[in-house]
Design a protein with these regions (language model features):
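Alpha/beta enzyme core
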Residues: 2-194, 199-250
Length: 250
């Protein structure tokens, strides 16, 4: 319970960092490497695939809040019973890589079934697909909020390819998700977490747009060594802290 309390505290302070191992990443060695790097780098939560073994492994080896991602309500119920701290409807990148697009109606249906199954005594986060029209994103976010979802995650880079290299390319990838964050923050009361293209360069943009948290995936989980992963997480966490400190001084 302490882990999720710490995440909620960071969420309230608008500086929470969640590291995403991947909805389709069932490689226990890699997931543990990402989770340990997330903790050592100062992140607040780790997001893993729906597997009892992975949940047990991460809980036994870290003190992070454990998010479990799936689009199957039954798997999310299993995750709750296995000790997950939060349930994530998403992340959808694995589906996009297969050419599958998930609709607003599908997300809402999954959320409804999940809430019915798991109740309201565990944090539920839902990803709003970045490829749908922004007006539909807003409507979906409002419907999810009315349903009792606690946290909205945005996305964007799955449908946007960067045209530039370096820092400019990173910004191009993140800009759609950041823009979606601005709109959703204006239209819902629950916190918003920005994901897709988030790095130490783009994380401050997300918080400036109104996000309460960032979800960071490929820039960490695609690295080969735990040392590299830890350093990357640390750079993101430090960028977030620096952004918050600057905002407080203004």
């Amino acid at each position: 319970m302490k882990a999720i309390a710490n995440f909620k505290k960071a969420l309230k302070a608008k500086k929470a960092v969640k590291i995403i191992a991947g909805i389709d990443n069932f490689d226990a060695e890699n997931v543990l490497k990402v989770a340990k790097a997330a903790e050592r780098g100062g992140a607040d939560a780790i997001d893993i695939a729906a597997s009892e073994d992975l949940i047990k492994l991460v809980r036994e080896n870290t003190s992070l809040a454990v998010f479990v991602s799936s689009t199957d309500p039954e798997e999310l119920l299993m995750a709750k019973n296995a000790g997950a701290d939060a349930l994530e409807i998403g992340n959808f990148d694995a589906y996009y890589r297969k050419g599958v697009r998930i609709s607003a109606e599908e997300v809402l249906e999954i959320a409804q079934k999940t809430v019915e199954l798991v109740g309201n005594d565990i944090m539920i986060c839902a990803t709003v697909p970045g490829h749908i029209d922004i007006s539909k994103q807003v409507k979906l976010a409002q419907d999810l909020e009315a349903l009792g979802v606690d946290l909205i995650q945005t996305e964007g880079s799955a449908t946007v390819e960067a045209q530039s290299a370096g820092a400019r390319g990173l910004i191009e990838k993140a800009i759609v998700s950041v823009a979606n964050t601005v709109e959703l923050c204006k239209n819902v009361e629950i916190p918003v977490m920005t994901a897709s293209g988030i790095t130490c360069t783009t994380a401050p943009m997300a918080f400036a747009a109104g996000a309460s948290a960032v979800g960071v995936g490929s820039c960490v989980n695609k690295l080969s060594s735990e040392l590299e992963m830890t350093a990357t997480v640390m750079s993101i966490v430090n960028a977030v802290k620096a952004e918050k400190t600057s905002a407080e001084l203004v």
